[in-house]
Design a protein with these regions (language model features):
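TPR-repeat structural position
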Residues: 51-53, 90, 134, 174
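Amphipathic alpha-helical segments of tetratricopeptide repeats
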Residues: 61-65, 98-109, 143-147, 182-190
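Conserved alpha-helical positions within TPR/SEL1-like repeat arrays
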Residues: 78-86, 115-130, 156-170, 197-207
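Conserved small/polar residues in nucleotide/adenosyl-binding loops
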Residues: 215-219
């Protein structure tokens, strides 16, 4: 039933996007690109990533098979890697990330390539965190943040900031953790993130303050 709903949702998005694309190109002001199609697909599929990663894998592989732009293709591949991670297929996720990184290393630098690097290093940071490699996760998340700053999509800066804060807290650097949680709040404000979606930041800050207070009490 959920798959039927998702298919209907995708078709509806597609119809609206096509109407918009035709109206824009008829006036000679805009031509739909492969990255436009990817972003449309991403907005449609992202809610299913944690709920039904197998479905995301199938649909994303299908999108990749018809992608004619290499940058768009590797954005799909990185999304596929995320789905593999949710399925706990870490070998497949790593293989996809490695392929995407090789492409980025050989590509002409651009904001879209920086976005890809940011996604890759953010995922690598999550993998390191799962494996208990806290110092390595900090390095990866910092790279992800730096690349995202140079990218075209800054909407994820608050998420990477939270990941960095969590990583610093796990290493015992509560001061840096608090700093990155506050940065995350600042990005939430600038991006107008709803209050109900800021819980990880508030919870993280509360945990830091509790840990610091406990440390002071035991001294």
């Amino acid at each position: 039933m959920e798959n039927i709903h998702l298919i209907f949702k995708f078709l509806w998005y597609s119809v609206l996007f096509c109407i918009w694309g035709v109206s824009c190109t008829s006036s000679g002001t805009y031509k739909k690109t492969q990255m436009d199609i990817y972003m449309q697909y991403y907005d449609f599929i992202i809610d299913s990533l944690s709920k039904n990663p197998s479905y995301v894998c199938t649909r994303t592989a299908r999108q990749m098979s018809v992608a004619t732009d290499s940058v768009a293709y590797y954005h799909y591949l990185v999304l596929l890697a995320k789905a593999y991670m949710f399925k706990s297929e870490m070998d497949s996720a790593k293989l996809s990330m490695d392929r995407a990184e090789v492409f980025c290393d050989g590509a002409e630098p651009s904001s879209l390539i920086n976005d890809l690097y940011a996604e890759i290093y953010n995922m690598r940071g999550n993998v390191c965190a799962r494996q208990g490699l806290t110092d390595s996760s900090v390095v990866c998340f910092q790279k992800a943040f730096d690349y995202r700053l140079k990218g075209s999509n800054r909407d994820m800066l608050h998420d990477i900031s939270i990941n960095l804060a969590d990583a610093f807290v796990r290493t015992g650097h509560y001061d840096k953790g608090a700093m990155w949680y506050r940065k995350a709040l600042s990005y939430c404000d600038s991006l107008k993130i709803p209050e109900e979606k800021r819980f990880p930041v508030y919870y993280g800050l509360a945990q830091v303050y509790m840990a610091v207070s406990y440390t002071h009490l035991t001294l």
